[in-house]
């Protein structure tokens, strides 16, 4: 029996000083054993995003998928740190689950830390991130 897979992409920015790199946040939801896996060279604080994202989704009145969620932060060679990827991870997961439009989500650059209640908190380095978004032709941040 084939397992049904659902995929979605969102985008964020990784900053090293004033230089930024676009990070593709890919989410896959598969019909295998439930779990939440984050891959692509995340640091310890980013690994904690799994718990923030899960709580924020549930406390926003949405349903976190009861399936295996795999989130890949690409390119894997770029170091990712901090909580600014929370929003991109959450919208990518929700788009893969069908709760948001994948096409709409992929047109934006998503930057923000999530509170456990689902609120979006500001992050540092927004100006350099906006400049990178402009360079790659993304009008929505």
Each model region followed by its residue ranges:
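Peripheral, non-AAA+ core regions of ATP-driven protein-machinery
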Residues: 1-140
């Amino acid at each position: 029996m084939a397992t049904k897979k659902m995929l979605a992409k969102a985008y964020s920015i990784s900053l090293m000083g004033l230089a930024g790199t676009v990070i593709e946040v890919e989410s896959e939801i598969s019909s295998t054993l439930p779990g939440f896996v984050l891959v692509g060279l995340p640091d310890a604080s980013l690994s904690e995003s799994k718990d923030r994202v899960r709580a924020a989704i549930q406390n926003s009145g949405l349903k976190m998928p009861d399936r295996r969620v795999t989130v890949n932060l690409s390119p894997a060679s770029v170091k990712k740190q901090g909580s600014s990827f929370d929003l991109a991870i959450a919208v990518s997961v929700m788009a893969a689950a069908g709760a948001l439009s994948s096409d709409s989500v992929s047109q934006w650059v998503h930057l923000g830390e999530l509170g456990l209640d689902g609120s979006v908190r500001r992050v540092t380095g927004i100006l350099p991130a906006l400049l990178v978004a402009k360079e790659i032709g993304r009008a929505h941040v």
